[in-house]
Amino acid sequence: MKLVLFLNMGGATNLQDCEVFLKNMFNDPYILGIKNRFLRKFVAWIITKARVKAMQENYKKMGGKSPLNELTQSLCNKLNLKQDEFKFDFVNLYVPPFATEILQKYTLNESDEIILFPLYPHHSCTTVTSSLEVLQNEISKQKIQAKVKTIDIFYKNELYNEMIVSHILAKKSKFDAKILIFSAHSLPQSIIDKGDLYEKHVNDHVEILKEKLKDHFDEFILAYQSKLGPVKWLEPNTSDVLANLNDKALIYPISFCIDCSETIFELGMEYKHLAKCDYDLISCPNDSDEFMEFILNSINSPLARKTSC
């Protein structure tokens, strides 16, 4: 068996899971860098209690759940129907399905292969490293003997970027804006200052896409969303950019592969009340045919795969 596991943070599928998501996220040492495990757990509990009601109210506006799990499951289902060499499934970091239950679904031996596919185009310790570490620890804990490989970050991949360009231009044909905003999930500046590659990768990715789209837009803006708390985060804020923009714009959520609360609610609903200009949101790759083509190409390419340590 060749088992491909998509890795993501996950999204709450009901209002009760909002608390589970927050508790697990803020108890992640890559998110909340408190070395003492008990102190980190206590601080995570405080933050969760302070934020859970607001998160639940936001989720109610999306129908009570994030679309992330359903879209990822749809992606897996379509890929499993499209071919029979690989079996596709997914693991979330902060809400079910977790690594333990997914790995227990399969009987794996030395002749089998697990391919870990983080659904993050850019590297960050808060996403890629954290997800891979959890999976590799669980594989070791369950004494699984299968060979483990990972798909490397893919923001430079030509197929992936041609897909993005195609999706952007398809939306532009219906909403003719001259400004394109690339909105990336923000990170605290302190994480970047410790050597995290995320900001560099996002900047490099924007330059690649600008070159491909330079004949279609007059202006490109990189902005960052989803800031939390009083510490310094990557800037400018997407909300501030929209509040000060006079001309209509398109937004592409450059750091997301699957639509989630950050795209559907934050970009699609919340910022509408802050924006001076009219804007439209481009969907993430989700379960599109082009994204599936990129995925199958990646897992079949030895250049895209590396053996995990």
UniProtKB/Swiss-Prot annotation:
Gene Ontology MF term list: ferrochelatase activity; metal ion binding
Main localisation: cytoplasm
GO biological process terms on file: heme biosynthetic process
Write out the residues that bind Fe cation. Answer: 185, 262
Its Enzyme Commission number?
4.98.1.1
Q: Where in the cell is it found?
A: Cytoplasm
Q: Which Pfam families match?
A: Ferrochelatase (PF00762)
Q: Which CDD domains match?
A: Ferrochelatase_C, Ferrochelatase_N
Q: Which UniProt keywords apply?
A: Cytoplasm, Heme biosynthesis, Iron, Lyase, Metal-binding, Porphyrin biosynthesis
* A single cellular component GO annotation: cytoplasm
| Matching InterPro entries | Ferrochelatase, Ferrochelatase_AS, Ferrochelatase_C, Ferrochelatase_N
Catalyzed chemical reaction(s): heme b + 2 H(+) = protoporphyrin IX + Fe(2+)
* Function as written in the Swiss-Prot or TrEMBL entry: Catalyzes the ferrous insertion into protoporphyrin IX.
Task: Name the family.
Answer: Belongs to the ferrochelatase family.
Q: What is this protein called?
A: Ferrochelatase
Question: What gene name is listed for this protein?
Answer: hemH
